[in-house]
Amino acid sequence: MLLADLGADVIRISRKETQGLESKYDVHNRSKRTITADLKNKATVNELLRLIKQVDVVFEGFRPGVMEKLGLGPEVCLEANSKLVYGRMTGWGQDGPMSQLAGHDINYIGLSGALNAIGRKDSTPTPPLNLIGDYGGGGMHLALGIVSGLIHSMKTNEGQVVDSAMVDGSLSLMSFFYSLKEMGHWQDGRESNLLDGYAHFYDTYECKDEKYIAVGSIEPQFYSELLKKLEITDEIFPVSYTHLRAHETEAY
């Protein structure tokens, strides 16, 4: 979807039994063309290899080894098109002890530590939709890898395999916080740090109309403006978090 939005001509290969009738309301299908194919049919595979000779990128999301069994693995495809960028998306990577296991976003971000960092301290970790593993650590990392591979291919005429695993991508997104912890600037435990709900000026509050407001007044000048708008007269910065959080909640 992202590459199509950027202008790429994307052709989706769908199972023959679907007849290419994936939901027109699924945003992931926008800006794409769809063809159907029986990948277990040798003649069909040969037709796809002829198509692969003409394209810049192939990417797939099967479990490790499936494309090889179908006769469409990276070695075969790169032999057909030496400039090809071959993208692969899995949950746990192409090899390793967990590579053949099933999984979902919540599993990948659980292992990477992202899930444990989100939520209130007196509750269980809160699943943040499937934004971190599937999209941020998965699709967006793969899209960046593919674009980088294309630049390399354009400059060198050499294709390559781009291997993207959602568990690796979500761990990469956590690298800043792990570096803060190593430097002594991040504490274990939810609601213990500036960006995880500890700071009263970076949090959400329920308003009198039963809707919610998100406050992000980290910088002193914005914090001063926040106090002014809420008619809170404390002049010392920083002040008692507990004291001001109570005043801020009351103001909303």
Outline where the language-model segments fall.
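Aromatic-enriched alpha-helical interface/lid elements that frame and gate functional surfaces
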Residues: D196, F201-R245
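Short beta-strand "acidic-cap" motif of Rossmann-like dinucleotide-binding folds
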Residues: D9-I13
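Active-site-adjacent "lid/gating" segments in soluble enzymes
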Residues: L2, L6, L70-I213, S217
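Short glycine/proline-centered loop/turn elements that form peptide/ligand docking sites
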Residues: R15-L21
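A structured beta-alpha segment of the ubiquitous adenosine-cofactor-binding alpha/beta core
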Residues: S31-L78
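A short, hydrophobic C-terminal helix/tail in secreted or cell-surface proteins
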Residues: A246-Y252
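Conserved N-terminal glycine-rich FAD pyrophosphate-binding loop of Rossmann-like flavoproteins
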Residues: S23-N29
